[in-house]
Amino acid sequence: MAKLTIRPATADDIAAMAELKSTYVRSLYRGFISQDILHRSTPDFHAATLRAWLESGMYRILLAECDGVLSHYIVFGTNPEEPHNGLIYEGVSSSFTSTEDKRLLVDRCLQELREMGHTIAHLWILMDNFRVRFLFENLGFRPDGARENRNMFGQELHIARYQYKLK
């Protein structure tokens, strides 16, 4: 059986996380965003964002490795608009990551948000992406009724906020 290791990300992990993110975005948003825009999802583009998040100190990044190979990661921290609530900024996984492994990483993220003193964790999900909505609903997240239209990748997308009660 494969060995799963969950640990905080370091600067040495940025290249691998950026490569995974580039592949993930192209897969996740296929059918929602034009291919021309998706081809701009490059590792260099994502590395800059990941580096800024890691260096800011405002965000935490946990990653999971399966037998030493990066399989998924999650970015989270304090919600700047609601400091008593945590916010999961993104979760990225490879195509071979099991639902159980995703659950273990999300559980660790939620535990750290609890330890930070948060009472609720929020997560924004593309409304048309039923696969991701189904995953997080199975992990205990529920839509809280908040919805927004956000310009992402040069295109307006409809997103819904999900919440998880930490206490």
Across the structure, where does each feature detected by a protein language model lie?
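Hydrophobic pocket/interface hotspot
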Residues: 17
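Glycine-rich phosphate-binding loop
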Residues: 100
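Conserved catalytic-core motifs of GNAT/GCN5-like acyltransferases
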Residues: 122-126, 142-158
